[in-house]
Amino acid sequence: MMLGRVEKYLLEKIAAEKSIHITLVDPENITPAQASLVAKNSKNSGTAAIMIGGSTFVSQDHLDAVVKAIKSVVDIPTILFPNNVSGISPHSDAIWFMSLLNSVDPYFLIGAQILGAPLIKKYNIEPISMGYIIVGEGGTAGIIGKAIPIPYNKPE
């Protein structure tokens, strides 16, 4: 399988630097101007990319505005961290194509991916595979994703 531009960039940075930092911007409680400031400061501090997403719904227009604002101030990749099919913006460079591996709901294992794939292809967004496992309390992502979280203190 041929790697996309963003995935190749991330892997090359990891190989060269041994580890990288990726900043997560949750568009739910932030304005596009605030998001662009976070992205600019993060890039200046050495972050390799900006992830955009969260556990709850944000309007498509707001998500698009946040992605565009971030892209206007940084030249590092933007990677969507989608909460659902509604978390796809045509303005992003890439998207984590996630499967919530400890969900009891098939929708979060493969259903959302099936629904989102045509949009990702249409928008020409680079998909990057990710197996996602919720640990600890699980928080909002665990509740929405119907996950059985892996406890931090699970005995061997």
Protein language model annotation of sequence segments:
Residues 87-156:
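Conserved anion-binding
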